[in-house]
């Protein structure tokens, strides 16, 4: 087995997306990089249906984040607490798509970000939240709020402020076009650092096997 795993851009805009060739109309590998002295690249991040572990891994790059902020400016992100998303060069999306709000946020990121990355297992394939896909949504709600052990004041929440759940949890490439996939539950801080620095530098992204294996 090779000790280096290359990540190439994805194709398509449906559930058939796979890491392979550059999609028509999308940036070529390295197109995000800007030669010469230019303004910092803008990066946005968000967490959909997940555990926030991928953002914790982003913070696990430790003191290297000081080097990262020399290269990029963070726009909307839980890290910055900026709520409104402006035009960005790079969007990192953690988590699967489980409710109507997730769909809205994800589509907003796709509209505003030149390059969109599925960050972590939940964004790539649905992850742990997608385990409910084996059951009907009604059965999940009943078990959680009505018939489960230790339930007090049973009843399925029906507040209009609560986003409506989708019947299934989807990986993000089933909703929007994705340019890169970075797997892991979560991907390590080292993997995120390698991915970001090579992408921002316009280099082919090659991650050592030690940064991606989970055996």
What are these regions (language model features)?
Residues 2-15, 22-215:
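Iron-sulfur-associated redox domains of electron-transfer enzymes in respiratory
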């Amino acid at each position: 087995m090779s000790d280096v795993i290359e990540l190439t851009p994805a194709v398509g805009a449906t559930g058939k997306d796979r890491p392979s060739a550059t999609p028509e109309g999308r940036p070529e590998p390295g197109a995000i990089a800007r030669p010469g002295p230019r303004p910092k690249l803008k990066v946005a991040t968000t967490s959909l249906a997940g555990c926030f572990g991928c953002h914790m891994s982003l913070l696990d790059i430790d003191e290297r984040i000081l080097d990262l902020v020399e290269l990029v400016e963070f726009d909307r992100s839980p890290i910055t607490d900026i709520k409104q998303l402006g035009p960005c060069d790079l969007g990192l999306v953690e988590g699967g798509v489980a409710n109507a709000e997730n769909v809205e946020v994800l589509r907003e990121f796709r509209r505003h970000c030149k390059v969109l990355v599925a960050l972590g297992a939940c964004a790539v394939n649905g992850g742990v939240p997608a385990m409910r896909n084996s059951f009907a949504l009604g059965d999940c709600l009943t078990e959680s709020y009505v018939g489960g052990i230790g339930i007090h004041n049973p009843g399925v929440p029906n507040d209009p402020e609560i986003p409506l759940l989708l019947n299934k949890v989807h990986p993000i490439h089933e909703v929007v076009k994705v340019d890169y996939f970075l797997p892991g539950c979560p991907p390590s801080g080292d993997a995120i650092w390698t991915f970001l620095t090579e992408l921002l530098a316009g280099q082919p992204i090659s991650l050592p096997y030690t940064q991606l294996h989970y055996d």
